[in-house]
Amino acid sequence: TVLRSLKGNIKLNGKIRFGMISIGVNNIFNSHNSYKSIIDIDGDLIFNGKVDFNTGIVLKIFKTGAIEFDGRNSIGRFSQIISKKNIHFGYCCRCSWNLYISDTDFHFVKFKNIIHNNVKPISIGNNCWIANNVSISKGVTIPNNTIVASNSYVNKTFEQEYTLLAGIPAKIKINDVARVFDVEEEAYWNKYYGWM
């Protein structure tokens, strides 16, 4: 892990315990930790609970930016999270590999002689599952209990919970759906279907 800058603030809220923040976590999809992560904090990085970062991640927080994790979060390998304003991950929000999320476009664009703000906050709700190769752009709100399918681009706010978002750009594809996060329930279904 490369600590490029720690000029900002790292805030640990709640009960602090060993393993609360893990960087370079190995799992079945990432069996070695030779990929370096880059941590560049000039703004605020806020932890309200446990967060696991796989290898090869980039966290870039500009002086005016903030990234906040509510706990039971995981960020998959090769993910990039970049903030100039505010990015908030709700409780038990899990993200697979190659996530790209940025609350800025970095460059200004003139459209019909008007230059709009290129920075807007992002909020991801509780109990969300963001699959691999997903991009989330500025100004997006993803509600609680949402699944975002692989290879999707989320560029607008959604309000309805218990949906599957998919596509470029992402649209609601299925209603009344949610990922199972409970370990015991998942073990039951693995056994039920003969996977254990």
Could you tell me what each predicted segment is?
Residues 130, 137-139:
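Extended serine/threonine-enriched, polar tracts that run as long, contiguous segments within proteins
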Residues 155-167:
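Gly/Pro- and small hydrophobic-enriched strand-loop and loop-to-helix capping segments
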Residues 114-125:
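Glycine-rich NAD(P)-binding loop of Rossmann-like domains
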Residues 125, 142-143, 147-149, 153:
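A generic "structured core" feature
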Residues 129, 147-148, 164-166:
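Short-chain dehydrogenase/reductase
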Residues 1-102, 125-127, 134, 144, ...:
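Domain-scale signature associated with acetyltransferase and cell-envelope carbohydrate enzymes
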